[in-house]
UniProtKB/Swiss-Prot annotation:
Claim: Isomerase is one of the keywords in the record: yes
Catalytic residues as annotated in Swiss-Prot or TrEMBL: 93, 141
GO molecular function: triose-phosphate isomerase activity
Coiled-coil parts of chain: none
Family: Belongs to the triosephosphate isomerase family.
Function field: Involved in the gluconeogenesis. Catalyzes stereospecifically the conversion of dihydroxyacetone phosphate (DHAP) to D-glyceraldehyde-3-phosphate (G3P).
Organism: Thermoproteus tenax (strain ATCC 35583 / DSM 2078 / JCM 9277 / NBRC 100435 / Kra 1)
UniProt entry tagged with the keyword Protein biosynthesis: no
Protein's name according to its UniProt entry: Triosephosphate isomerase
Gene: tpiA
Amino acid sequence: MRLPILIINFKAYGEAAGKRAVELAKAAERAARELGVNIVVAPNHLELGLVSQSVDIPVYAQGADVEAGGAHTAHVSLENIKEAGGSGVILNHSEAPLKLNDLARLVAKAKSLGLDVVVCAPDPRTSLAAAALGPHAVAVEPPELIGTGRAVSRYKPEAIVETVGLVSRHFPEVSVITGAGIESGDDVAAALRLGTRGVLLASAAVKAKDPYAKIVELAKPLSELR
């Protein structure tokens, strides 16, 4: 995982469905190339293969099921993600929480497959527990701020500061990123100043009238950090 990082979660937004997912991913790729930063896209499972074939930037899955490949109807395995061209996976998002034992199994399996692993957590203490599982990064995301436009870096900066302190002290090999309510380049810059190595966001980019321009705005602080 190359840092600093900007991860754009497409969620299940209609603006990022079908061919629009490819268009958004290509806008992210263009911004990444022009700014020289690492931008990752996380399309819906249905579009993951199509997107991964259409761009050269990293493509992450939004989640995975603990079941391995085989007779598991309607499940998406880590093996499926890898085969479809995914290079990483986001786990335990507040909209798709996992039991601890399942999360531990998924982190270990994903790493064994060579996938980047980002584990989401709602607060500093849970972030520390997530870091103990050995992901490449933890993303602290207070759920009450997700989708509100009230950026964690401005409305709850103490969550970032405490998480960075705890994780860097006990698991320095695990990077800390953040998300929830990130809407602007200033929000991203504030998060980076607080010690994070990147941001995870969704609607700010996906729902923008001009996604390319918005992604450039959001990613520019990363280029200034390098």
